Amino acid sequence: MRVSHFFFLVTLEITATNPCTAMSHLIEYEDANDEVRAVYDDIRATRKTEYINNFWKAIANHPPTLQRTWQNVKEVMTGPGELDPLTRELIYIAVSVTNGCQYCISSHTAAGRSKGMDDAIFGELMAIVATANATNRLANGYQIPVDEQFKL
């Protein structure tokens, strides 16, 4: 490996693991344009809070992504459906753990706790996530054919 490649890889590793290194700046409400402020206002109204998460402030650097993402999250996480709000948060936490998204794990764990998740529920959820990931890897590794009665 050439020295230049080594330094590039080390830089990528440091950037990927350093929580203080942001890819873009955060857009505060007072610095936002009208399009971004409209989304922030909807987030505040929907969530019944004045707080805007850093996630939204970061993706506000591209207003179409902010708008599209908020509309999707709003519909899926707060719209009508058969799943209660805590179950939705538990699913979000499980997917975030599997994807390794520390930001999403933290924010949705906080949201889950505000909806009634306690340490026992969180522990049970982590056991399910760990078991599902382990058995998924086994099924993939062994290339197990799907049983006829399980096929969709």
For each of these PLM feature ranges, what is it?
Residues 10-12, 16-152:
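Hydrophobic alpha-helical segments
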